[in-house]
């Protein structure tokens, strides 16, 4: 039963799933925004709103695949050789994204992580990243959670500081 649920979710979030025209336009708008702001020294935020089940996660999965293809293969892209992560603070959804990454040449499982893991990893190495795509942002912590090794006050703020 668990594998059936994961396989169904994997199909729904696959970057090979056909997008509606509206979703495709949104992916293109976000890519345009990202390439415009990638070389700036300050963060830029693009927020996608929508009710549950409207396809936000599908859009983000397609978007991140496009970003990583550009980052890893398109020498003429402003995104070429950028360091990018997809963050989700839900273990089962993260598992689905990692499953998808295992099947695609330009997505690596290590590209997908939980917010606290990314924040702590970047702090440890004293590094920043170029692009962070956040799915299910309402699940980000807005207070310290030492039990889960999050010692700051707001995960969104901390991710923005590191991007």
Residue ranges and their predicted role:
Residues 1-163:
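The feature marks helicase ATPase cores and/or their adjacent C-terminal helical subdomains
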């Amino acid at each position: 039963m668990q594998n059936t649920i994961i396989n169904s979710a994997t199909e729904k979030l696959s970057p090979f799933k056909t997008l509606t025209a509206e979703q495709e336009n949104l992916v293109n708008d976000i890519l345009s925004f990202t390439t415009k702001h990638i070389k700036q020294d300050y963060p830029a935020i693009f927020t996608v709103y929508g009710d549950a089940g409207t396809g936000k996660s599908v859009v983000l999965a397609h978007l991140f695949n496009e970003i990583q293809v550009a980052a890893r293969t398109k020498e003429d892209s402003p995104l070429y050789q950028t360091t990018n992560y997809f963050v989700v603070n839900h273990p089962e959804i993260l598992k689905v994204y990692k499953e998808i990454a295992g099947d695609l040449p330009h997505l690596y499982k290590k590209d997908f992580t939980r917010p606290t893991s990314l924040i702590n990893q970047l702090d440890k190495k004293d590094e920043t990243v170029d692009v962070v795509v956040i799915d299910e942002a309402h699940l980000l912590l807005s207070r310290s959670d030492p039990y889960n090794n999050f010692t700051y006050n707001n995960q969104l703020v901390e991710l923005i500081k590191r991007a």
